[in-house]
């Protein structure tokens, strides 16, 4: 069934107006609606300017973090260079898409190198599973910088994006039909297409932690759908993209080897943002130190000369591993501890005391108890343990069956974690309060504002009308309890939109049956 929400057809309409209009026409023929979005930066008059966009460049630019819409009204040469213009409009388009995410059903872009660099960041900002197609002259080469770790469909334009002809009309028409098909008959990623209805877990794995991860996955598969990510840099980023998209219910980040590459300088880093989405998600997470005994390089000849004196292990013809040192492990521990200390959900860090990989055990090439000890002790020193954030030491190697059992046990434990509320502090949760005395509205609001200013939590209750007016004026609600009648009266058919002002977007709503 076709979505009632429009598809965005995005391009620099100062130079690609006819192409965007053609794609829009093809989409309309499929029964879908479309909005043409202009992200051009030039004001040079051209034959394309008679094609009017549905969303102007000025409107898109108004969503730039700097909100400097006037900048794009100037000729392109007012920017320091063309790259600055592309960056500016790319950032603005990200803001536009994020702000209007619920108002469109898919996004299709067209462009050369500049247009592709401008449009794809907004696509990467959208959740996995959201329809996104990019027709590009760059799609026959290395598309990693454009795609990142998300599911952008890249289509090579074959001919340059310069007018409608026998070749471009077919390619662009197919791209338009591809987009319409995704929107009309796409799969709901949260439920799959006739797939599992089990909660989804994300888990990181490497070849040298496979026995552990396989055992954990098999133990949990009756209750969960476990999606495994190869911790090769892109794998870690993909996991965190799914986490930030709200598509997983828990995390088993057992193989954190990408941190070693980030800290030391290997080729499989997931970047300095590794773990950010995980610790900020609030999701239950069991984390471990899988494969932190190694830094990854390509073939032996690719290892930088500065590491020639180090312990190297040729994993295969394309992969060479370098054993991490005591000092490097302390730095790795500092990186991980800093991230863990920012966690807002239940998180357990499991330390495999007898080895972090299949080659970090007695008799294997990377066994180094001193280096491992430095890693473990630094983590114990730096991680700020709380009721929800704990370190658990396991007296075995990571691939021993005991470790997998402990990982499963800890995950089940933290998924049933309950916050214990202390209701004995009268300053924050009074148990004896005077009966409410009706009074003039202005007087009530004055008292309300005084309480808000004091920083105390506020619980509001009612059918909706009264508390809505009060919180609209001052805001600061922590908890609002409403009756069904109030929900219908204020928002219509269960919607809370009318009840919740933007400034109270973080307030918690409870419905009384």
Where are these regions (language model features)?
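N-terminal glycine-rich phosphate/adenylate-binding segment common to multiple enzyme folds
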Residues: 78-142
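Alpha-helix-loop-beta-strand connector modules within alpha/beta enzyme cores
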Residues: 377-381, 443, 493-513
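N-terminal amphipathic alpha-helix/helix-capping segment at the start of soluble metabolic enzymes
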Residues: 423-462, 473
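Short, acidic/small-residue loops that bind anionic groups at enzyme active sites
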Residues: 109, 118-147, 156, 227-231, ...
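Glycine-rich phosphate/diphosphate-binding loop of Rossmann-like nucleotide-binding domains
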Residues: 16-28, 35, 45-54, 195-237, ...
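C-terminal non-catalytic interaction/assembly regions of soluble proteins
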Residues: 6-8, 15-35, 268-428
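N-terminal phosphate-binding or glycine-rich loops at protein starts, especially the Walker A/P-loop
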Residues: 2-45, 106, 115-125, 129-134, ...
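Phosphate/nucleotide-donor binding subsite
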Residues: 48-102
């Amino acid at each position: 069934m076709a979505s009632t929400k429009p598809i965005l057809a995005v391009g620099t309409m100062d130079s690609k107006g006819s192409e965007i209009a053609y794609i829009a026409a093809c989409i309309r023929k499929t029964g879908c609606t479309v909005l043409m979005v202009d992200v051009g930066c030039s004001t040079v008059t051209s034959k394309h300017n008679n094609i009017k966009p549905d969303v102007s460049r000025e409107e898109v630019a108004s969503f730039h973090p700097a909100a400097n819409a006037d900048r794009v009204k100037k000729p392109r040469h007012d920017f320091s260079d063309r790259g600055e213009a592309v960056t500016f409009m790319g950032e603005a388009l990200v803001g536009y898409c994020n702000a209007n995410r619920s108002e469109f059903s898919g996004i299709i872009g067209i462009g050369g190198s500049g247009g592709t660099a401008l449009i794809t960041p907004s696509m990467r900002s959208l959740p996995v599973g959201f329809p996104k197609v990019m027709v590009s002259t760059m799609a026959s080469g290395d598309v990693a910088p454009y795609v990142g770790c998300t599911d952008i469909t890249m289509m090579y334009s074959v001919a340059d994006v310069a007018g409608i002809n026998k070749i471009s009309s077919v390619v662009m028409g197919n791209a338009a039909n591809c987009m319409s098909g995704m929107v009309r008959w796409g799969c709901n990623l949260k439920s799959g297409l006739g797939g599992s209805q089990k909660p989804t877990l994300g888990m990181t794995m490497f070849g040298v932690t496979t026995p552990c991860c396989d055992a954990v996955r098999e133990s949990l598969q009756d209750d969960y759908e476990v999606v495994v990510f190869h911790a090769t840099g892109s794998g870690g980023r993909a996991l965190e993209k799914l986490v930030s998209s709200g598509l997983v219910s828990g995390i088993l980040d057992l193989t954190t080897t990408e941190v070693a590459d980030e800290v030391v300088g290997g080729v499989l880093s997931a970047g300095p943002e590794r773990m950010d989405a995980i610790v900020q998600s609030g999701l239950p997470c069991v984390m471990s130190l899988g494969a932190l005994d190694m830094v990854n390089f390509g073939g032996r000849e690719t290892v930088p000369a500065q590491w020639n004196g180090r312990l190297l292990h040729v994993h295969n013809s394309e992969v060479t591993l370098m054993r991490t040192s005591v000092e490097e492990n302390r730095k790795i521990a500092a990186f991980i501890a800093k991230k863990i200390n920012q966690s807002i959900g239940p998180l357990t860090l499991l330390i495999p005391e007898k080895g972090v990989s299949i080659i970090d055990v007695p008799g294997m090439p990377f066994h180094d108890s001193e280096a491992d000890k430095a890693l473990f002790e630094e983590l114990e020193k730096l991680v700020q343990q709380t009721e929800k954030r704990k370190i658990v030491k396991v007296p075995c190697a990571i691939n021993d069956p005991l470790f997998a059992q402990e990982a499963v046990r800890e995950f089940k434990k933290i998924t049933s974690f309950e916050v214990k509320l202390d209701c004995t502090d009268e300053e924050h949760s009074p148990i004896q309060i005077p009966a409410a005395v009706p009074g003039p509205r202005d007087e009530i609001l004055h008292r309300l504002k005084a309480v808000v200013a004091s920083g105390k939590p506020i619980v509001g209750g009612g059918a909706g009308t009264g508390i809505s007016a009060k919180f609209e004026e001052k805001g600061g609600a922590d908890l609002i309890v409403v009756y069904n009648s109030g929900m219908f009266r204020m928002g219509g058919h269960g919607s809370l939109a009318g009840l919740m002002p933007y400034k109270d977007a973080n307030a918690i709503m409870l419905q009384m049956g």
